[in-house]
């Protein structure tokens, strides 16, 4: 092979290598640009999620569940079926009972004692929700009192014009007895035990000692026994 042929062959080989290098470089550049766009999109999406409320995902799932429930309810109504019954058949008895209890708590939730005003308002809400309108008694009372007195104005004297029915009085008595019973159940104090050991100075200290005994009693039991027996530690 002559020198000229070797030179041309080397030039062609170098050109081929350079071409392959440029192609790989362009491919790497495209991959870099693609990765940059994907990273930018992920950063934008992460920033968008951070700006959303903390309960956004839970609210979104709840909204989707409510939409699905409305659709299922509409389908059941179109088929002439009772949606609550159909849903109960698809769930276990335990789940159905928990959902019913949650629904009742949602209507008038018990958030614990905050103030006497809140407690009174909650009781008022519960009592008014339990009232059933009696149209017959309403009409009779209107006839008995008269239209002018039944819809009073600022100049109307209504003292002594209300005549409760026997059934209404019975409901009142029954409700009062129920309130007393519930009050005894919720606010029942434990009886004093004279034989119980006294290791407290007041009620607050008594509760604190119970908490300590719950978590550290098994570690201090031997020390207490030694102190009571007078054994040297």
From Swiss-Prot:
It is found in: Nucleus. GO terms for cellular component: catalytic step 2 spliceosome; post-mRNA release spliceosomal complex; Prp19 complex. Residues 18-77 form a coiled coil. The keyword Repeat does not apply. Keywords: Coiled coil, mRNA processing, mRNA splicing, Nucleus, Spliceosome. Transmembrane segments: none annotated. Residues 17-80 have a biased composition (Basic and acidic residues). Residues 1-80, 95-119 are annotated as: Disordered. Residues 1-16 have a biased composition (Polar residues). GO terms for biological process: mRNA processing; RNA splicing. InterPro entries: mRNA_splic_SYF2. Belongs to the SYF2 family. May be involved in pre-mRNA splicing. May be part of a spliceosome complex. This is Pre-mRNA-splicing factor syf-2. The lineage of its organism: Eukaryota, Metazoa, Ecdysozoa, Nematoda, Chromadorea.
């Amino acid at each position: 092979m002559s020198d000229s042929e070797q030179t041309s062959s080397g030039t062609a080989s170098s050109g081929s290598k350079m071409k392959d290098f440029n192609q790989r470089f362009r491919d790497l550049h495209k991959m870099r640009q693609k990765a940059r766009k994907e990273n930018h999109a992920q950063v934008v999406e992460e920033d968008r999620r951070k700006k959303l409320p903390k309960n956004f995902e839970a609210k979104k799932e709840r909204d989707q569940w409510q939409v699905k429930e409305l659709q299922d309810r509409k389908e059941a109504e179109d088929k002439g079926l009772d949606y609550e019954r159909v849903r109960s058949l698809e769930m276990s008895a335990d789940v159905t009972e928990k959902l019913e209890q949650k629904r009742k708590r949602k209507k008038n939730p018990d958030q614990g004692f905050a103030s006497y005003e809140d407690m009174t308002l909650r009781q008022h809400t519960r009592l008014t929700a339990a009232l059933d309108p009696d149209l017959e008694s309403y009409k009779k009372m209107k006839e008995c009192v008269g239209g002018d007195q039944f819809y009073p104005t600022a100049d109307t004297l209504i003292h002594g014009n209300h005549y409760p029915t026997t059934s209404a009085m019975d409901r009142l008595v029954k409700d009062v007895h129920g309130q007393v019973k519930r009050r005894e159940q919720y606010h029942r104090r434990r009886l004093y035990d004279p034989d119980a050991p006294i290791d407290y100075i007041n009620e607050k200290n008594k509760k604190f000692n119970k908490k300590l005994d719950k978590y550290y009693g098994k570690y201090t039991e031997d020390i207490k026994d030694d102190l009571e027996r007078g054994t040297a530690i």
